[in-house]
Amino acid sequence: MKEELFKEKSRYITGVVLIVVAGLILYADNLLLFWAVLGGIYAVGFFEALRLFQVKASFSLYLILVLSWVAAYFNGHPVECALISAMVMASVIAYQKAHHSEAILPFLYPGVGFFALFGVYKDFGAVAIIWLLVVVVASDVGAFFGGKLLGKTPFTATSPNKTLEGALIGVVLASVLGSFVGMGKLSGGFLMALLFSFLIALMAVFGDLYESYLKRKVGVKDSGKILPGHGGVLDRLDSMLFGALSLHVLLYFLEIWKETAVFLGD
């Protein structure tokens, strides 16, 4: 009983600290600060992913990680750096034959998600990150309480504690709340913001499921222990990473569509 109470207390304290830190970073709205902090988090998440994919850590892995993250700061398209890092790692595997083929996987997950998260901030600003946070948090909260109150149908064997009803409630709540924040970022109004928020929330659900699948596959409860009461970095950011990639893709293609429309109009 005492252990459970301590865990819950730790969970709430850690949650408050994370919210305050995230709020301060977004308030500062400084690209270098955001890049540096997110880079440190990425390094921890990458280490956790090595465990989940059962890949042995090596100098070449972390060298590629650092160089690609530095390149992302100067590159106009950060997500490209994630894909290039995966290609470089594949080349190292082929040349050295010192790594198993699974060594490429941490550069895809969580790698692509972290680069997308940085890309969302770099290309679209702090408001887009706030939008993403609102959608992901609302999806998690809605799924948790919706599942507790109305959940009856198991969602998937990958995560047996989640229910279909909870997932649907979470997605609906995230779509509605996210649309009000997204309206400030989109010129298409409420309906476009609602559609984007729905797609982000949907991907966030599958981000959580994928993390659950990886942990279940290797027989661990949490991806790490760095966050008291929460587990590891990936336990907290799994939904965010999938959501970030979907948001970045949606906003990126929206920009292309606008530019094309202007070009054709001229």
UniProtKB/Swiss-Prot annotation:
GO cellular component: plasma membrane
Subcellular location: Cell inner membrane
Pfam entry (one): CTP_transf_1
TM spans (from-to): 16-36, 52-72, 78-98, 101-121, 125-145, 164-184, 186-206, 237-257
Leading EC class: transferase
UniProt KW keywords: Cell inner membrane, Cell membrane, Lipid biosynthesis, Lipid metabolism, Membrane, Nucleotidyltransferase, Phospholipid biosynthesis, Phospholipid metabolism, Transferase, Transmembrane, Transmembrane helix
One GO-annotated biological process of the protein: CDP-diacylglycerol biosynthetic process
Metabolic or biological pathway: Phospholipid metabolism; CDP-diacylglycerol biosynthesis; CDP-diacylglycerol from sn-glycerol 3-phosphate: step 3/3
Major place of residence: membrane
Annotated membrane topology: Multi-pass membrane protein
Keyword Kinase appears in the UniProt entry: no
Family of the protein in this entry: Belongs to the CDS family.
Protein name per its UniProtKB record: Phosphatidate cytidylyltransferase
This protein's encoding gene: cdsA
